[in-house]
Amino acid sequence: TFINHSSYQGRLKESTQLGAELIGIDSVEADAEMIAMVVDGLKKVGLKEFQVNIGHVDFLQSLMEATGLSKEQQEEIYNLIANRNFFGVEELLEQADASPELKETFRLLPEFAGDVDVLKKAVEHAPTDQAKQAVGRLLKIYKLLALYGADDYVTFDLSMSGHYGYYTGIVFRAYTYGTGDAIVTGGR
C-alpha cells in the first residue's frame, strides 16, 4: 500500500497491511477474540514488548452529545483530544452549557488511560448511561482477554474515538518500541 499524506511532505510512504474481519457478530466475545488474535499475531512475529490500547467510541461520543455544542465545536474537541491538548478542551467547554459533572469528566479524560483500574474510575465519573455501558463492555472484554492470556498486553484509553465516525464500538491500537505510530489499528 502506498500512502501520500500531506504530513509526508510529498514523499510516499509504503506499508504492508494485513486485515482481519469478523462479520455479523456484535458480541463482547467477538471483540475479545479479535484483540486476542492481534496479541497472538504480534507474538508470533517475534514481538515481546507491545501494548494493545483499547477504547470505546460510545464513551467519548456520549460525552460530546451531552455538551450541547455544535458539530463543528465537537469536531474541534475531537481534534484537540486526538492531539492530547486537554487544556484546549477545557477552554472550549467553558463556552458550553454543560453540567459541572460533565466538564469534570472531560477534565479527567487523561486519567482514564492505563491498566484495567482506570475503567473502575471511569465508570464512577461516567455521566451518561451510554458511557457506563461502554465501560462495562470494556470490562467484560478484559475478563475474556484474561482467559486468552492476553490481558498483560492490554491497556485502556477512553479518549480514543476512531476516525471520522467509521467505528461504532471498540477501537484499538497496538504500539511497540522504536515506532512513532501504531503498528496495529482496528475496531468495530
Which residue stretches match the model-derived regions?
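Acidic, His- and aromatic-enriched active-site or binding-groove loops in soluble protein domains
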Residues: 68-91, 98, 176
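Short, solvent-exposed helix-helix connector turns and helix-capping sites enriched
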Residues: 56, 84-85, 115
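Short secondary-structure capping/junction motifs at helix and strand boundaries
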Residues: 46-52, 72-75
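Hydrophobic mid-domain F-helix/FG-region of cytochrome P450s
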Residues: 37-43, 58-66
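Active-site-adjacent beta-strand anchor residues
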Residues: 53-54, 157
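Positively charged, Gly/Ser-enriched RNA/tRNA-binding surfaces
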Residues: 1-48, 92-188
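Short glycine/threonine-rich loop-to-helix capping motif typified by GTGT followed
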Residues: 61-71, 165-172
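Short, conserved phosphate-binding/catalytic loop or strand-edge motifs used
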Residues: 13-18, 54-62
